[in-house]
UniProtKB/Swiss-Prot annotation:
This is Protein TusC. SUPFAM superfamilies: DsrEFH-like (SSF75169). Belongs to the DsrF/TusC family. Its main location: cytoplasm. GO terms for biological process: tRNA processing. The gene is tusC.
Length: 119
């Protein structure tokens, strides 16, 4: 069975990549059973709770990440270096329970996937 990794590497608001990525995950989950989600670079900002995008006239889609478990998507990973570069750490209260990996182990994990889709 093919394994698909979704990588979120952009900030959540201002562009629609994050929302489109989430929609793609929900669509593809009907076809592929092994899906994992990775947050790297500015993508780690997708994980922050209590965002208020309505102040910039954007829709708060990040709460939709919480229903990933209903689609049996439980492999969620985040880059430790990306967190630290943005003043965050794995003690922050995120919207998801994620495994924080160093850059090396994150790359090793990504190498196992048949397809990697970046948003």
């Amino acid at each position: 069975m093919k394994m698909v990794a979704f990588v979120f590497s952009h900030a959540p608001h201002g562009i629609s990549l994050g929302r489109e990525g989430l929609d793609a995950i929900f669509s593809i989950s009907l076809i592929f059973k092994k899906i994992s989600v990775f947050f790297i670079g500015d993508g780690v900002l997708q994980l922050i709770k209590n965002q208020q995008p309505e102040h910039i006239l954007a829709r708060n889609y990040t709460s939709s990440f919480s229903i990933l478990s209903l689609y049996n998507i439980k492999d969620l990973y985040c880059c430790k270096a990306s967190l630290l570069e943005r003043g965050l750490n794995n003690n922050n209260n995120f919207i998801l329970n994620i495994d924080v990996l160093d850059s090396y182990n994150l790359r090793l994990k990504l190498d196992n996937y048949d397809a990697i889709i970046n948003f």
